From Swiss-Prot:
Main location: secreted
Positions of Cell wall-binding repeats: 157-176, 178-197, 1089-1108, 1109-1128, 1130-1150, 1152-1172, 1173-1191, 1193-1214, 1216-1236, 1237-1256, 1258-1279, 1281-1301, 1302-1321, 1323-1343, 1344-1365, 1366-1380, 1415-1434, 1436-1457, 1459-1478, 1485-1505, 1508-1527, 1528-1547, 1549-1570, 1572-1591
Record function comment: Production of extracellular glucans, that are thought to play a key role in the development of the dental plaque because of their ability to adhere to smooth surfaces and mediate the aggregation of bacterial cells and food debris.
Taxonomic lineage of the native organism: Bacteria, Bacillati, Bacillota, Bacilli, Lactobacillales
EC number(s) stated in the UniProt entry for this protein: 2.4.1.5
Positions of region (Glucan-binding): 1099-1597
Single annotated GO MF: glucosyltransferase activity
Protein name: Glucosyltransferase-I
Reaction catalysed by this enzyme: [(1->6)-alpha-D-glucosyl](n) + sucrose = [(1->6)-alpha-D-glucosyl](n+1) + D-fructose
Family: Belongs to the glycosyl hydrolase 70 family.
Further remark: GTF-I synthesizes water-insoluble glucans (alpha 1,3-linked glucose and some 1,6 linkages), GTF-S synthesizes water-soluble glucans (alpha 1,6-glucose). GTF-SI synthesizes both forms of glucans.
Amino acid sequence: MEKNERFKMHKVKKRWVTISVASATMLASALGASVASADTETVSEDSNQAVLTADQTTTNQDTEQTSVAATATSEQSASTDAATDQASATDQASAAEQTQGTTASTDTAAQTTTNANEAKWVPTENENQVFTDEMLAEAKNVATAESNSIPSDLAKMSNVKQVDGKYYYYDQDGNVKKNFAVSVGEKIYYFDETGAYKDTSKVEADKSGSDISKEETTFAANNRAYSTSAENFEAIDNYLTADSWYRPKSILKDGKTWTESSKDDFRPLLMAWWPDTETKRNYVNYMNKVVGIDKTYTAETSQADLTAAAELVQARIEQKITTEQNTKWLREAISAFVKTQPQWNGESEKPYDDHLQNGALKFDNQSDLTPDTQSNYRLLNRTPTNQTGSLDSRFTYNANDPLGGYELLLANDVDNSNPIVQAEQLNWLHYLLNFGTIYAKDADANFDSIRVDAVDNVDADLLQISSDYLKAAYGIDKNNKNANNHVSIVEAWSDNDTPYLHDDGDNLMNMDNKFRLSMLWSLAKPLDKRSGLNPLIHNSLVDREVDDREVETVPSYSFARAHDSEVQDLIRDIIKAEINPNAFGYSFTQDEIDQAFKIYNEDLKKTDKKYTHYNVPLSYTLLLTNKGSIPRVYYGDMFTDDGQYMANKTVNYDAIESLLKARMKYVAGGQAMQNYQIGNGEILTSVRYGKGALKQSDKGDATTRTSGVGVVMGNQPNFSLDGKVVALNMGAAHANQEYRALMVSTKDGVATYATDADASKAGLVKRTDENGYLYFLNDDLKGVANPQVSGFLQVWVPVGAADDQDIRVAASDTASTDGKSLHQDAAMDSRVMFEGFSNFQSFATKEEEYTNVVIANNVDKFVSWGITDFEMAPQYVSSTDGQFLDSVIQNGYAFTDRYDLGMSKANKYGTADQLVKAIKALHAKGLKVMADWVPDQMYTFPKQEVVTVTRTDKFGKPIAGSQINHSLYVTDTKSSGDDYQAKYGGAFLDELKEKYPELFTKKQISTGQAIDPSVKIKQWSAKYFNGSNILGRGADYVLSDQASNKYLNVSDDKLFLPKTLLGQVVESGIRFDGTGYVYNSSTTGEKVTDSFITEAGNLYYFGQDGYMVTGAQNIKGSNYYFLANGAALRNTVYTDAQGQNHYYGNDGKRYENGYQQFGNDSWRYFKNGVMALGLTTVDGHVQYFDKDGVQAKDKIIVTRDGKVRYFDQHNGNAVTNTFVADKTGHWYYLGKDGVAVTGAQTVGKQHLYFEANGQQVKGDFVTAKDGKLYFYDVDSGDMWTNTFIEDKAGNWFYLGKDGAAVTGAQTIKGQKLYFKANGQQVKGDIVKDADGKIRYYDAQTGEQVFNKSVSVNGKTYYFGSDGTAQTQANPKGQTFKDGSGVLRFYNLEGQYVSGSGWYETAEHEWVYVKSGKVLTGAQTIGNQRVYFKDNGHQVKGQLVTGNDGKLRYYDANSGDQAFNKSVTVNGKTYYFGSDGTAQTQANPKGQTFKDGSGVLRFYNLEGQYVSGSGWYKNAQGQWLYVKDGKVLTGLQTVGNQKVYFDKNGIQAKGKAVRTSDGKVRYFDENSGSMITNQWKFVYGQYYYFGSDGAAVYRGWN
């Protein structure tokens, strides 16, 4: 390199020397001083300025030895005086060229040297150099700055905007694009992680000269390691890390004097060596603040300047050590600095969101670098679905859970495929189940059973191992009694797990997760997200529509919530939404948790909940009354999840307690469930028939009659029966029996009734009918909304059960012969589990608050609830590493010593002694106690190891682009060796092998090998783990040489150290050598070739010739792109000149083909290096990728072609032939091509309509393309047909059989109507036909008017017999109706008649006008009884049937009504009596007739008139009753009977009749008596007839 230096004379100890001005200004820069210009400054003869030697030429060879504390170098310049440059090199240059050693000082005698090729050397005698205060004097600060220039064409780009002096690229939606490069012409513009344009045209190369200063040599000589012996280094497994310290040869005591180090004088490695220039600069800047130097260095600072600055920092460090008399502060400072560097923190471990703890690491099975951590096993994902390494053909493949689980769940993941580990798991299982015997020498304190945690995340071999132990130790396969005494359960979420366990013998019991999901979505979700109720019957391991089985197919336990299900998820959501939006996963602080629970607990008390579950009492009603599964009650549903143990009851406590107590007393027998639409919603019913009655028809015994339960519930708060009736068939055993309410929802919550008397007092007692039906009427079932219920709930039980009735069944000791251990029979159904803890309960503040103490004091309460199996919290002393929620809240699932059950100290739940007392107390009352077996993971161990790891997802699949790829990583995987693991690990294997030898010979499925007891694991280490979580230590925490990828190691056989630690001066960094840019290794100082180098956060590649490459490159089969400054594109989308997008990962490699994951469930797809955008067909499936290339999942997308599609939430495929709803509640139907249909569509049997945007029309009118109007149902969306409908404006329409609104004249159900062209019905208006005829349609009914006059808008029309109008202008001899509907008359002269009198009409008929009104109907005028038609015309010579139904006759001449005479009309003779009404004239036998007064009379079968009283049969054999000569009609009381006679006097029998009061009554088919207070099935419907005999129509069927 060329150098341009200016020299100046300085007086040093009375001798003049020449010093490079560049060197002086450099050190001045380091010191932050300000002095005059170097080439004009005058130095006095007496100046005592310190000599700051660097690449200098001295004019006096006898210059005294000078000690310095900083290095001075010169700035590179384009023009140079070659002679000066050469002169400045002097002996420093020659020293740099030496191959045998490095000179410690340029003006002293040669010291002992070290051959650079030798691996070891020994320390030499110390040279006690003295640094004076003068040597640290202030100097001049010279700084230069280079401004970035913005290309003119960049500023012209329409997408680029300038903001605050920086340029940003905006996408089509106005969002700033980050980590983005775009090709424009022949140029590439790069926008960094902030989105700002970054000039990448210049290489950031060091401008320093290659000469080495005396000070550099001095520091190198003294900072070298005391020796290469490992004892002089703080290493992990002999590997050096960023936190490593070492013993240097000398320390700069008090920052002044080099003094030989003692064995205790360790210093941070980073004080003397750095892996790259960027880290070195960051170190200097960071430590400057620590030691009080006010100076900041930038990327423009030269290596020489940084070296000088680092030396000054070292001097200040030593000064502070002298002052503080310790290095504690320095260790804290260095550790803190390390965490700021991306290669040593989580930045280089990204992505963060593919694992519960941000990310996973898989340990390499084979690695020469870490042979002690190797394994022959680590068979990942060997779940029940994939136990052999291939998918089990017995089970259903689920694309969303392909392996039925995954391996890397949390923390240090135990390798449960390792036979040695499998033996240790058996050892630990035995210890747990025999804890009382082993720890307290008291078998009564042993656990009875286990819960197996996280089954889908461990090797399924453990299920065989634990099952075989339970069979061997307890004989659970021998009989039900043994099995029920040791019911062990598993936490296994895959649908394949239960059939797997069943095929294996049902030795362990799994959860009914399907039923949990049914409760969640049918009941617990907010109203707008709830499903129907039908899944509660069918979506379960047990179909309960009719369950009359003695034994279910598979055993199971059921729950609504658990310690880690629907609790911590809700707390996470609250924290994310309301406390810390940057929170990720389950990494919370205790303070955040405390804040979240304040919101959570208040939300639980609200009617309209935002986070917590709705309808908890409804869920528990089903859990605790269902047949065929053991219910598990969760502690947090009865007591608050937070707070002291059992201190605070929830709002649902009373309801759950009531159900628990009722379960023991009533819940037994077969079960039937129904779900149907009724009223304005749907209901769910459930009936248990009682002990001894499996079927509805079973009569059972006395206990059957006093047991059983009926449930009615709904999930709609606005529910109403709307007059309908619900009938529960309680079973034949319960006919004609009283039932009473146990629990009823009210407007305020849930009311519970503990006794028959309580319910009776509340009026909540019902009686079944003779068929065992219990009926619920309109007022019984109403939806409510309160903090407990959003819907309705009623639970009913038989009256009369004894207070101490207990219907539970004991297990049989009869030998089991079906090859199964657990049987879900009545005895198993009698059990109730209690998950007796919450993750979030508070830490005890005093002894009596410890969980296990409280449990022991409350055993009687658990007994009163009917608890049979008490599931204890995991009793392990918790890790406190705070890496995951479990170790923050210390719930027992995060531990480092599995055998420490509160022996070393109290855990969250108490001490080991308190645990013993709790177990014994539970046992004393007959309860079984369950331990939590957690074989999946272990947390931060106290000792560290270096392990070869690869960054993977939770399945162990490598993460594309990760910097951690077969890399060394420091893990917390080694236990102390002096804990309870050391005491009990493997301790029981020999005993177990002797007692149960079959356990040690059975070959396990995943390995094909038996468990291996030969090695007793006394100390955990990495070789027993599959992997771990990322720990935030970064990709390069274990230090290495970038060029060679060799790790720094201090072992004898792998010794590799930076030459700096061997006393040599190393010049590193990117430099220009006159031909191109090269890189010198910070470790060896040598020029690198064929190597990737990370410098200043950028990735470079130096080719086979050692020169930096640019542009597109294919290196060892992978494609990269290097910008003009040599930096590779990383984590960047690059849009090329053709507009195609490419993605370069964290390792700089271009993603080539297939899917690549970005975040938890964010995917991109690539083909031949091109990133998919928009609609893309992948393997025959249409998928969509947004403008950033991210795959659409669970999204409705309007694609570029304007069509609407929905992409599946799991696989992202376009969904076909399916309905989907968006977040606003709009529905779409995706056709066979995946496109949302539009317009009129027939889907199944429904006729639907979809808008142009694909949204389904519901509850609205649609004008279709044919111009016709249609209406679609508000709920189903189905098209209405053959019905009237009113719009919001009050207009009526009629929708025809094709659904279209009819137009024009229509006859509908006998009515002549008219509809406008837009479908609106005409009412109260005239219509003119095309032929000019006018018609009028009534204002109320809309019916066409005939034979009447109507005034419309002041004009009078008369509408004749054909309904058409005749002009009425002063009509002569005509009647008409005025605007008020009053009939008026114009006389034959055309004059309006306003007075009174008789008038002849134009038809020569007569009308009578009274005060201007034309009379109609029966009238008395003078002495005449006359009758007028509706048009006012008098009736003459005609019969008239009056409104009373009676027949009258008016004389043909006078019009007088006929009285007491016979008249023949139309050939038929009538007799009109004294009242003027007609009577039949003969004396018929067995017939009724009306006399002249209208009184109904009767002639008996002999033809004799009946004048007395009594029952008589008529000619048709029907009965009637005559009282004092009159035939009775209507509702009558005869004797003690309430009977009914029709208008002809005929008695009603076996029929329902609507009586004169409008009510329907039913009369017995035999006696004819009116029935009361009972149900009757009539005409296909049920009616309930009350105490007055009146029916309440309910329509239940």
